[in-house]
Amino acid sequence: MSVSAAQKTALAWVETARDVLSADCARIFEFAEPAWREYRSSAWYVERLRAEGFTVEDGSGGMPTAFCAEWSNGAGPVVGMYAEYDAVPGNCQA
């Protein structure tokens, strides 16, 4: 299977950002906020995304912990993501 130039670029970026991405995941894990109360996590993500140049709508859909982030560099592919990061009581993260 051949790897396209775009795939090589994406893989190189992930490799370069690996430590930062890992630290970001650890930070959210450490907040360990239960469902509907992810206030610190949400605020951290919103700040982080804005620092990276995203336009962020916080409080999306009337939910204080929900947000929608958007970034564009022109026409091209669109990537959508959805994340659940609440801690579940009784499991290792809560």
Segments and roles (model prediction):
Residues 3-94:
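Acidic/His- and Gly-rich active-site-bordering loop/insert found
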